[in-house]
A protein has these predicted regions:
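Membrane-embedded catalytic scaffold of the fatty acid hydroxylase/desaturase
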Residues: 74-262
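Membrane-helix interface linkers and caps
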Residues: 47-74, 94-108
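Hydrophobic alpha-helical transmembrane bundles that constitute the permease/transmembrane domains
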Residues: 11-15, 51, 164-172
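Cytosolic-facing loops and C-terminal tails of multi-pass membrane proteins
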Residues: 247, 257-299
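Hydrophobic core of alpha-helical transmembrane segments in multi-pass integral membrane proteins
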Residues: 13-26, 43-50, 90-92
Length: 299
C-alpha cells in the first residue's frame, strides 16, 4: 500500500507543488502583497520537500551528510539573500519605476498579464541559458560556477549554493533584458518567483516521475544529468526554467532508459570551508595549492 502511495505522489508532486506555489503567488497579487505570499509559498515548498526527501528520496545515499550544510546556507545568504535582493529589489526595482511609462520600450503591455509572464520567462531564459553555458565553457567563469557543481549530492539545501559572482553574471543580463524591453514590474516579480520555485524543485532529492514535463521545464531529472561528472552529460541542460533554448541549440540531454548518475560533482579540488570557496576563484595557483595541501593534511 505504501509503495502505491509513493508512486502516486511521485507522479503528482512536481506539478502539484508548482501549481500550489503559483496559485499562492496569484492570490498574493490580488492582495497586493506578492512578495509576502512568495515567501509563504517558498517556506511551504521547503517544508514539503524536506519531508519528502526523507520519506521517498531519489537517492538514499544523498540523505547522508556531506559536511556542506553550513557552507550551503552561507552561500544561499551570500548569493540569493544579498546579491539578488540588493540587485533585484533595490537597483532593479528602482529602475523599473522609471520604466513604468507605457510609452517606453517595445514590450506588449496590452497583452493579458499571463501572456506577458509567459513571454518574460522565454525571453529571460535566453541570457540565462548563455550565461550558464559560458559558465561551463569559459575557464574564467567556470572557476565561480564550480562552487555550485562541487556538491556530491543534490538536495533542497544546496539549491542556493552559488558564488555571488556566479549569481551576478546571470541575473544582470536576464533582468536587464526585460528592463530594456520595457517589461512591467509584475512580470519581473512573477519571473523571480517562478525561477525560485523551479530551482528548489530542480535540486530536491525526491523521487519524481516527470514524463513529458521534462520536455518543457527544467526538472530534477534533467538537472541530475547536468551535475554528472561526465562532461558529455554535464555540459547539457543549461536552461534555468524552460528548456526551449537547450532544444533549439542542441544541448538538451535526457536518457529515459537509465537513471542519472548518483556519483556527481567535479573532478577538481574544492575546499570545504565557505570562506575558502568564496576566495577560491580569485587565488593564484600557488595559493590554491597551499589551501589544498592544508585541507588534505587536516582530513
Amino acid at each position: 500500500m505504501e509503495s502505491k502511495i509513493k508512486h502516486f505522489i511521485s507522479c503528482i508532486a512536481w506539478p502539484g507543488l508548482m501549481v500550489l506555489c503559483m496559485t499562492m503567488m496569484a492570490y498574493g497579487f490580488t492582495r497586493d502583497r506578492p512578495v509576502l505570499y512568495f515567501n509563504v509559498a517558498y517556506v511551504i515548498l521547503i517544508v514539503t520537500l524536506f519531508f519528502l526527501e526523507r520519506w521517498m528520496p531519489h537517492e538514499r545515499e544523498w540523505t547522508k551528510s556531506d559536511g556542506q550544510t553550513l557552507a550551503n546556507i552561507l552561500h544561499t545568504l551570500s548569493s540569493k539573500g544579498t546579491t539578488q535582493l540588493l540587485l533585484l529589489f533595490g537597483g532593479i526595482i528602482g529602475l523599473m519605476g522609471l520604466m513604468e511609462d507605457p510609452g517606453r520600450g517595445i514590450w506588449p503591455r496590452d497583452w493579458p498579464l499571463a501572456a506577458q509572464v509567459l513571454l518574460g520567462v522565454v525571453v529571460a531564459e535566453f541570457p540565462l541559458y548563455w550565461a550558464h553555458r559560458v559558465g561551463h565553457e569559459w575557464p574564467f567563469l567556470w572557476r565561480f560556477h564550480a562552487v555550485h557543481h562541487s556538491v556530491i549530492k543534490l538536495w533542497i539545501v544546496n539549491t542556493g549554493r552559488f558564488h555571488f559572482v556566479d549569481s551576478l553574471y546571470k541575473i544582470v543580463p536576464s533582468v536587464g533584458l526585460l528592463l530594456a524591453l520595457g517589461a512591467p514590474l509584475a512580470v519581473v516579480i512573477w519571473l523571480s518567483a517562478f525561477t525560485g520555485f523551479i530551482g528548489m524543485l530542480t535540486h530536491c532529492n525526491v523521487e519524481m516521475r516527470l514524463g513529458p514535463l521534462s520536455w518543457i521545464f527544467n526538472t530534477p531529472e534533467l538537472h541530475r544529468w547536468h551535475h554528472s561528472k561526465d562532461l558529455r552529460e554535464a555540459n547539457k541542460n543549461y536552461c534555468e526554467n524552460v528548456m526551449v533554448w537547450d532544444l533549439m541549440f542542441g544541448t538538451y540531454f535526457r536518457e529515459s532508459h537509465r537513471r542519472p548518475p548518483a556519483d556527481i560533482g567535479i573532478r577538481e579540488f574544492m575546499p570545504p570551508r565557505f570562506v575558502d570557496q568564496i576566495m577560491w576563484p580569485f587565488l593564484s595557483q600557488e595559493g590554491k595549492q597551499q589551501i589544498e595541501v592544508g585541507c588534505r593534511l587536516i582530513s
